[in-house]
């Protein structure tokens, strides 16, 4: 199912160079990126899967097929996401242009997928910290 998501990401990615400049060993490219809003897609998938898993009687369902169908539906009805991104390049020791990368560039290319992923992992981390603190307080009180 992840392959399906990343294929849709690649298929729907459009990058239009708006402006570029070169100054010695540095270059800047301003681009307009259009892709699907993967942060929204992932949020919708998570919400819909939670409902499916929590619905009584769904335990016998082939959840992989349900998951795949939800992904197809979300991709089919996804909103576009547009962003203006600046790519900075520098020449390496061999004279080849290399991307001076940062996470924001990758997130723009991925339609917000990385930001969604990081937020979910951060929330999970805080949820675990809260749970551990509550367990510690309960143990201390007993």
Residue ranges and their predicted role:
Residues 2-75, 124-142:
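Surface-exposed, charged secondary-structure patches
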Residues 51-62, 75-128:
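Short beta-strand edge/turn micro-motifs at domain boundaries
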């Amino acid at each position: 199912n992840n392959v399906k998501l990343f294929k849709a990401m690649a298929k729907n990615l459009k990058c239009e160079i708006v402006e570029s400049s070169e100054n010695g060993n540095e270059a800047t490219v301003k681009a307009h990126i259009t892709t699907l809003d993967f942060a929204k897609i992932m949020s919708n998938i998570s919400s819909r899967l939670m409902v499916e898993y929590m619905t009584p009687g769904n335990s016998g369902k082939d959840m992989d097929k349900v998951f795949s169908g939800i992904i197809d539906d979300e991709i089919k009805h996804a909103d576009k996401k547009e962003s203006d991104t600046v790519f900075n390049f520098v020449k390496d020791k061999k004279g080849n242009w290399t991307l001076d990368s940062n996470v924001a560039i990758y997130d723009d290319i991925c339609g917000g997928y990385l930001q969604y992923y990081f937020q979910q992992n951060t929330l999970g981390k805080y949820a675990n910290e809260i749970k551990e603190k509550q367990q510690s307080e309960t143990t201390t009180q007993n």
